[in-house]
């Protein structure tokens, strides 16, 4: 989360289902953390909504897509087991038991009936849902076709980059001249590692090396000295 905010990865959108329930207890029993404030401190765009409201979800997604400086966290305050009913038809909402176990017996039937479904035919697809999905499928086909044409045009205009990209995603091991690595007898292993990383930095352009504020100690800076820092 911190590195995404630091790098300003604005094409990253994350959902957080904040329902205050975990497997054995309510979350308030074990944490007082303010998740929204934490992510704002990490330079995230944070949007808080009613996670059970479809229109609010849609609006939040549109706002997240419009953000061009920061990643976005959409925190949806939700009701765990919304609409669920117990065997005696009392509410099963906000109950930890619904976190890790299926609804059984009459609880299953009561919940289906409460939500407007038929327990005898639970997998029926309503006509309006069929129509919605069919319409969206056609829209997505058009989006995919347009994207394919864009990628073809880019590949024609950038043949070298296209070939490089294809190689990177092919799954083939990169070609490395291991003879270029020079080691000193009796040298510390971290220094030996730095020599290897330096050679890889020069020969494997899509390689990323990370070290949590220790690069000059664990010698992962052997990689950095032959390339450049990955920053925003």
What are these regions (language model features)?
Residues 1-134:
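Glycine-rich ThDP/TPP pyrophosphate-binding loop and its adjacent helix/strand module
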């Amino acid at each position: 989360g911190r590195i995404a905010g630091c790098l300003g990865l604005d094409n990253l959108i994350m959902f957080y289902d904040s329902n205050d329930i975990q497997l054995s207890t309510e979350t308030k029993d074990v944490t007082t953390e303010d998740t929204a404030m934490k992510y704002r401190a990490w330079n995230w765009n944070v949007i808080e909504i009613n996670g059970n409201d479809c229109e609010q979800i849609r609006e939040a997604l549109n706002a997240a897509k419009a953000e061009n400086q920061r990643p976005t966290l959409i925190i949806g305050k939700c009701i765990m087991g919304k609409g669920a009913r117990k065997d005696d038809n009392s509410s099963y909402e906000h109950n930890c038991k619904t976190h890790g176990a299926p609804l059984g017996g009459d609880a299953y039937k009561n919940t289906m009936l409460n939500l407007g479904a038929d327990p005898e035919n639970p997998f029926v697809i309503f006509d309006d849902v069929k129509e919605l999905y069919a319409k969206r499928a056609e829209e997505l086909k058009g989006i995919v076709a347009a994207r394919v044409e864009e990628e073809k045009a880019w590949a024609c205009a950038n043949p070298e980059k296209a070939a490089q990209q294809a190689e990177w995603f092919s799954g083939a091991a990169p070609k490395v001249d291991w003879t270029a690595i020079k080691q000193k007898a009796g040298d510390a292993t971290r220094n030996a590692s730095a020599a290897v990383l330096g050679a890889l930095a020069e020969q494997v352009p899509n390689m990323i090396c990370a070290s949590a504020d220790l690069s000059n100690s664990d010698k992962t800076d052997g990689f950095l000295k032959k390339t450049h820092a990955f920053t925003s």
